Amino acid sequence: GIARRIVDFASALIDFVTGALGCVSMLACMFFGALTGSGMATTSAIGGMMIPEMKRKGYDSSYAATLVCFGGIVGPIIPPSLSFVLYGASTKTSVPDLFKAGIIPGVMIGLVFLMVNIIICKRTGTEVHKPELGPGGERIPMIQFWKERLHRVGKATKDGFWALLSPFIILGGIYSGFFTPTEAAAVSVVYSIIVSLFVYHDMTWKDLYKTFVSAAVLNGVTSFLLGTSTVFSTFMTFEQVPQM
């Protein structure tokens, strides 16, 4: 439910350009990556919705999959990022500083991918849009076009408000000192559960149980990697390997 509302919001912003679905996929990956901090979760959630739709619009299957995979890479660069938390814990680097360092590069990479997608779609003739023309091919005034566009963006923002609010709560809490980056992960999970169960009603208690089981398996793998990498990092420091 949260992923679908993020896609609807991204679609309202940019679905009038050439290669709109590809751009929506990339933009949705950026938003969803900022919400979850996980490239795997971003690719799975957005790809499951957008790849079949892109194929129906004439996109090549491999191109559609590649586009979503790139979006899954960009999403975790934009804070809050699980990769940054793991890197900071392993190398004793400040996680808030890593988050700050990831904002501009993440946004810039995402915008470059958007432009590349538009150029490729123009060259291949895939999903070419002319925003000045209406559904029947009639020319519409630009004032009317932007008025309708703003109305749609406003509606999508209202519908997806609670989903879009999550990154601001997480980052605001971290930078204000209200909670640590580690605690922010717990806040994000609790917030998402509350929104999905009681606000959007998109998740059942049975779905929540399955989610907990899946998360436990993934966290087991991640914890093992983090533990071994921390031991290896400490060993390298004690043996002064970087100074050799």
Enumerate the predicted regions with their spans.
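Alpha-helical transmembrane segments of multi-pass membrane transport proteins
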Residues: G1-M244
